[in-house]
Amino acid sequence: MHVVTHLSEKYESLRNSENGWSIQEAGMAQLDDIVGSVMKYLKENGLDDNTMVVFTTDNGAENFTWPDGGQTPFAGGKGTGLEGGFRVPAIVRWPGKVPAGKVENGIVSGLDWFPTIVAAAGNPDIVSELLAGKKVGDQTFKVHLDGYNQLDLITGKAQSARHEIFYLTETTLAAVRIDDYKYRFTDQPGGWLGATEKVDWPILTNLRLDPYERTGMFNGKDNGSIAYYNWFAYEFWRFVFVQKEVAKAAQTMIEFPPMQGGASFNMSAVKAAIDKAIAERAMGK
């Protein structure tokens, strides 16, 4: 669901004083029926046993537009570098391939779906082929995919191929996660609509011990711990790992520079574009 949500009359009518449903419950009922119609089509056309169905979403709850945007138990929400902005549900159905009822807690990114689905279709080497340059028709594609083939993970044959994930908020590297540890470089006390602050000391979190990111320096008002500083000091050596991961990712941008700049929702990016256009015009370009 996404702001502004307009339910069809059938589902809007489900909201009444007796059940106390909000737009969320009625919207989920409509979404459930939409998914059901897709599954029904696959079954009626004999495709359901040989089709991989992935149900997921592109970002965490947009809780600043509540109630449309919903809520999340995780800290933050859409547009932030906190878990609430990135953690999403993912359900995979592929009869005879994906074990029914199996729960996986390994790290998976939305970037992984393309190489995974291509592998399921018969080509497990798409990532390396694109790195070398793959010709399709009259065009050659030479690109760096940041996704991993997770086919062995979803079929129950192996653990996740991914150990790291980069949290990008617009064009800012807000955090990096490596296995259980998350290293956060920014803070957004006002959420997506507020300012982004660069912290002097990266905020270190063990997401297995603190999945809701409640623990930090004790300041008398937030969920902090008087023992956090001591724990942080003993774990500080881990920053060598994040330095290596960021350096490795940065190295790929030399051979494969970004095709376009990231989107920005603040006026500084607009001003920079205007200033560039004015300068180019003055030079006669």
Give, region by region, the residue ranges found by the protein language model.
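Long, internal low-complexity/basic segments
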Residues: Y183, P189-G190, G194-I203, L207-K285
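Non-transmembrane alpha-helical segments in soluble domains
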Residues: E25, D32-M39, K43, F114-G122, ...
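Metal-dependent active-site segment of extracytoplasmic phospho-/sulfohydrolases and closely related
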Residues: Q30-W66
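Catalytic cores of eukaryotic secretory-pathway lumenal/extracellular enzymes that build
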Residues: S13, S17, G79, R87-I91, ...
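Beta-strand elements within well-structured catalytic alpha/beta cores of enzymes
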Residues: M1, M28-L31, V35, M52-T57, ...
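Active-site regions of oxyanion-processing enzymes, predominantly non-cytosolic
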Residues: M1-S13, M39, K43-M52, E83
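Active-site His/acidic residue clusters
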Residues: M1-Q24, E62-F64, D68-T72
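C-terminal cap/loop subdomain of S1 sulfatases and analogous C-terminal strand-loop tails that border
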Residues: A61-E83, V98-K102, G106, L111-R214
